[in-house]
A protein has these predicted regions:
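Consensus positions within tandem repeat domains that build extended binding/scaffold surfaces
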Residues: 52-54, 74-79, 97-102, 120-126, ...
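Short mixed-charge
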Residues: 198-200
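N-terminal low-complexity, Pro/Thr/Ser-rich intrinsically disordered segments
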Residues: 1-4
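A structural signal for leucine-rich repeat
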Residues: 171, 191-196
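Structural signature of tandem-repeat unit edges
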Residues: 6-10, 15-18, 26-49, 59-72, ...
């Protein structure tokens, strides 16, 4: 393996598998487009992962385009990208690491693809400008403090595929007044909820298909 910067993006290249991982570089900024393949020494490498902390504290990063070749987004990959307003996660991605988008305070909307089955701890914590989250029917678990301190979030839809929600998933989401749950009250009550999911929230109503539950 070796590391190389190609057209402004730093990669770790694996000559055996011919795959590439986007890795940490301090000065990513503006609008970044990650290609599906990169070439070095006449060999083509498939970009399959965004590594842990790859864009950590890149405060001037505004948007990122992730190719359909990427299957994994690492831990804290975009943490503290305070100017990041737009990101599209392709449906090739199957896992999103802990805290991957935490503290992205300018991010207003996020769509999680159906290829993902669980949302990791702290994944979108402290995204204080987040207004809209799309959680697909493929999701079975929501981690601890996943949306904590998303202070602009007023409503979120949770599919009936979800079987567990971690402690403090909506901690200090001060304006979260409505959770739209696609299942019944009985299905909601059967979800494994670790401690209190909305601590620090004045009042939240879960709207189920057959009635409401007050948290």
């Amino acid at each position: 393996m070796f590391e190389k910067i190609i057209k402004g993006i730093k990669y770790r290249l694996d000559e055996d598998s011919l795959t590439a991982v986007v890795i940490r570089k301090k000065d990513y900024k503006g609008n970044i487009v990650i290609p599906e393949n990169v070439v070095s020494k006449n060999l083509s490498y498939r970009v399959t992962r965004i590594g842990n902390s790859a864009f950590y504290r890149c405060w001037d990063l505004m948007s990122i385009t992730i190719p359909k070749s990427v299957t994994h987004i690492g831990k804290y990959a975009f943490t503290y990208c305070k100017s990041l307003t737009t990101i599209r996660i392709p449906d090739s991605v199957t896992s999103i690491g802990k805290g991957a988008f935490s503290d992205c305070e300018s991010l207003t909307s996020i769509t999680i693809p159906e290829s993902v089955t669980s949302i990791a701890d702290h994944a979108f914590g402290w995204c204080t400008g987040l207004l809209n989250v799309v959680i697909p029917d493929s999701i079975t678990s929501i981690g601890k403090y996943t949306f904590s301190n998303c202070k602009s979030l007023t409503t979120i839809r949770i599919p009936d595929s979800v079987k567990s929600i971690g402690n403090g998933a909506f901690f200090m989401c001060e304006t979260l007044s409505n959770i739209i749950f696609n299942g019944t009250i009985e299905q909601w009550k059967n979800i494994e909820i670790e401690k209190k999911l909305n601590l620090g929230v004045p009042a939240t109503t879960v709207h189920c298909s057959d009635g409401d539950v007050e948290l």
